[in-house]
UniProtKB/Swiss-Prot annotation:
UniProt lineage: Bacteria, Pseudomonadati, Pseudomonadota, Betaproteobacteria, Burkholderiales
Sections of the chain in a coiled coil: none
Protein name per its UniProtKB record: UvrABC system protein C
Subunit structure: Interacts with UvrB in an incision complex.
One term under GO cellular component: cytoplasm
Gene Ontology MF terms in the entry: DNA binding; excinuclease ABC activity
UniProt xrefs under SUPFAM superfamilies: C-terminal UvrC-binding domain of UvrB (SSF46600), GIY-YIG endonuclease (SSF82771), RuvA domain 2-like (SSF47781)
Pfam families from the UniProt entry: GIY-YIG, HHH_5, UVR, UvrC_RNaseH, UvrC_RNaseH_dom
PANTHER family given in the database record: UVRABC SYSTEM PROTEIN C, UVRC/OXIDOREDUCTASE
Domain (GIY-YIG) ranges: 22-100
Native source species: Burkholderia ambifaria (strain ATCC BAA-244 / DSM 16087 / CCUG 44356 / LMG 19182 / AMMD)
Gene Ontology BP annotations: nucleotide-excision repair; SOS response
Protein purpose: The UvrABC repair system catalyzes the recognition and processing of DNA lesions. UvrC both incises the 5' and 3' sides of the lesion. The N-terminal half is responsible for the 3' incision and the C-terminal half is responsible for the 5' incision.
NCBIfam families: PRK00558.1-5, uvrC
């Protein structure tokens, strides 16, 4: 993305370096187009930034990055810890090309116990509040649902929506199969239900032994009072809990909330496997693959530290933080310590630093982190402890159960990385096959950009177009776009295709033309960086889900915009719409191609086409459902957002509102009898 402060004047580093202070802070490098190249943190800004421009033995990639620097910005902080926090925020926000970057996943699922008189268990994603109880985060939706099933089996807490709970007149099926105590119909008192909720919360917090002891005491008390049915119910609850504890690996101890981090590097890629233990229960794991890792690690290996500045510079490089390049002396020490393994270890430690900073700063962090490699940062752990409000311990060589967990995490990281490398090899082969099939010449196949369009509607209703993007040998979901199609005859797919292609590429063509005009006015010969970036947004291949008719519409649009029609390829479905029978139709008059089921090129085309279809149809269905679910209530006179929300909550949805009588409608807060009659008339 181009910054509004694109640089047009020559860059003179000496003047800038002379003005830098000997203070901690964060520095940012920008290119001529205003795009950020790198974000780093330094104990001494002057020493750190100067090291990039005073060394002569730089690796080719680093030398290339330095030549692209056109502007330097610095921010002074009060401490190195503040610099670390600011660096982490900027890396997430700017996604620099030469920093290790993990996808910022803020949607970890939680298990929620609501603040209702009879609390409900629920799967939850989003920001947490203080009103309800939240347990987690969990590594996956499956882990949350498994925990809910366990709590249903042992403590029989309800999972129904409040609107359903408030309107039940008899127990549901879950009560009949022993998964709910039916508080909706008064089958259990509020006090007894509160005890079950408390036991469930303690179970999730890892205090299983307390729960078992109290249940045992309760069972004996019922037996002493000759209440044998109640005693048998508690005995069954204890049996279910004992079965759960036996089936799962449970760690007994005060610090039963643990995260296990295993890092594996292989084949130029790195995997971080995060396993979560909550309440002593292993909840599963999740694999992360950082972006920009190749450039960032090459930067780290290239020797951009501060050894020229003496001992202080060496100390700073030894404590290099996530995304910050290590110095040549540190690299030399690594190589001397172990010719075979030290380099890999430094790479993995660098990635682990980046992951810990980006994953935990500003989020919940457990008291114990078990790691496969020792992070290089000395300030990171202190900052995590300060933000969490409790001490965060790092365990490098665990024992017992934790050692088994770390071993399992390392094995899963290796398996995930091997699977990724295998898939990448297959995808690269498919990309190469497609380029050869279409006679497309490309020096770097990773830069081959393919966009695919599809139209979806239901009998002309809720028409939507999708655009999916493929480059670097994989689908780029962050670049997908949906387009609401309006102003056409319902069901006219040709008009819809014309509209989406025009909206997609008209602005890109204008941006490229403006960049070229600006360069011409500035007297720049050849293609500048600004013009190259504008042109790079245009795809190399455009796939159209359709036959000759759709391709002809696309050809007309591209001709009007002055674009090359040879990049247009239609994907016509074969007999029975079976994969492998498609025909590729070209806009420039080439003979249509039938590649056959075994063609690697056709496999890639089908993959991209199917993804465009999926993305279009899910968007269309959501749009259609929203229109059908809410339109009738939104059209009611005298019903605003609050009253509409109360009606839906009271009757459980639009169908319940339609089925309600005038008296039932009038019983809702804010609905008078006259307004209830008006609502009833408008709905019937």
């Amino acid at each position: 993305m181009t910054s509004p402060e694109a640089v047009d004047i020559p860059f003179e580093p000496k003047k800038i370096l002379a003005q830098l202070p000997h203070m901690p802070g964060v520095y940012r490098y920008y290119d001529t187009a205003g795009a950020v190249l790198y974000v780093g943190k330094a104990r001494d800004l002057k020493k750190r930034v100067s090291s990039y421009f005073t060394k002569t033995q730089l690796s080719p990639r680093i030398a290339m990055m330095v030549t692209r620097i056109a502007r330097i910005e610095t921010t002074v902080t009060r401490s190195e810890a503040e610099a670390l926090l600011l660096e982490n925020n900027l890396i997430k926000a700017l996604a620099p090309r030469y920093n290790i970057l993990f996808r910022d996943d803020k949607s970890y699922p939680y298990l929620k116990l609501t603040a209702h008189r009879f609390p409900r268990m629920a799967y939850y994603r989003g920001s947490v509040d203080k009103q309800n109880q939240y347990f987690g985060p969990f590594p996956s939706a499956w882990a949350v649902r498994e925990s809910i099933q366990i709590l249903q089996r042992v403590f029989q807490l309800r999972t129904c929506e409040d609107s359903v709970f408030n309107n039940r007149t008899r127990p549901c099926l879950l009560h009949q199969i022993g998964r709910c105590t039916a508080p909706c119909v008064g089958a259990i008192s509020a006090d007894d239900y509160a005890i079950d909720v408390s036991n469930a919360a303690r179970f999730l917090l890892g205090r299983q032994s307390e729960v078992m002891k109290e249940l045992e005491q309760k069972m004996h008390a019922f037996a002493a009072e000759l209440k044998f049915e109640q005693a048998a119910a508690v005995r069954n609850q204890m049996s279910s809990l004992a079965t759960v504890l036996h089936q799962q690996a449970i760690e007994v101890g005060s610090d039963s909330d643990v995260d296990i981090l295993a890092v594996v590097a292989q084949g130029g890629r790195v995997c971080v496997n995060l396993a979560m233990v909550r309440g002593g229960r292993h909840l599963g794991d999740k694999a992360y693959f950082p972006a920009h890792v190749e450039s960032a690690l090459t930067l780290a290996e290239g020797g951009l530290g501060d050894e020229a500045d003496g001992a202080d510079g060496a100390d700073e490089a030894a404590a290099a933080l996530p995304g910050e390049p290590a110095d040549e002396a540190a690299a030399a020490r690594d190589a001397a310590s172990s010719a075979s393994g030290a380099s890999s270890a430094s790479v993995e430690a660098e990635v682990l630093d980046a992951f810990i900073a980006q994953h935990y700063l500003g989020n919940r962090v457990p008291p114990v982190l078990v790691v496969s490699h020792a992070p290089a940062s000395r300030d990171l752990l202190e900052l995590l402890s300060e933000q969490a409000g409790h001490k965060v311990s790092l365990v490098r060589q665990p024992q017992g159960q934790r050692r088994a967990w770390l071993s399992m995490a390392e094995q899963n990281a290796r398996l995930a990385l091997a699977r990724l490398l295998s898939e990448q090899g297959s995808q690269q082969a498919r990309t190469r096959a497609l380029a050869e099939t279409l006679s497309f010449e490309c020096d770097d196949l990773a830069m081959l950009r393919i966009e695919c369009f599809d139209i979806s509607h239901t009998m002309g209703e809720a028409t939507q177009a999708s655009c999916v993007v493929y480059h670097h040998h994989k689908m780029q979901s962050g670049e997908y776009r949906r387009y609401n199609i309006t102003g056409i005859t319902p069901g006219d797919d040709y008009a819809a295709m014309r509209q989406v292609l025009t909206r997609r590429y008209e602005k890109m063509v204008e941006q490229a033309a403006q960049a070229a005009a600006a360069d011409a006015a500035a007297g720049i010969d050849g293609e500048s960086t600004r013009e190259a970036e504008a042109s790079s947004l245009l795809p190399n291949i455009v796939l159209i889900d359709g036959g000759k008719g759709q391709v002809e519409i696309a050809r007309q649009v591209f001709t009007e915009l002055g674009l090359d029609t040879s990049m247009l390829v239609g994907v016509a479905k074969g007999e029975g719409r079976k994969v492998g029978l498609e025909t590729l139709v070209f806009a420039d008059g080439r003979t249509p191609l039938e590649l056959g089921k075994e063609s690697a090129a056709l496999m890639l085309v089908a993959q991209i086409r199917d993804e465009a279809h999926r993305f279009a149809i899910t968007g269309m269905r959501a749009k259609r459902a929203k229109a059908r679910q809410t339109s009738r209530l939104e059209e009611l006179e005298g019903i605003g957002a609050k009253r509409r929300q109360r009606l839906l909550a009271r009757f459980g949805g639009l169908r319940g509102v339609v089925a309600a009588s005038v008296e039932e409608l009038a019983s809702v807060e804010g609905i008078s009898h006259a307004l209830a009659e008006q609502i009833y008339k408008q709905l019937h």
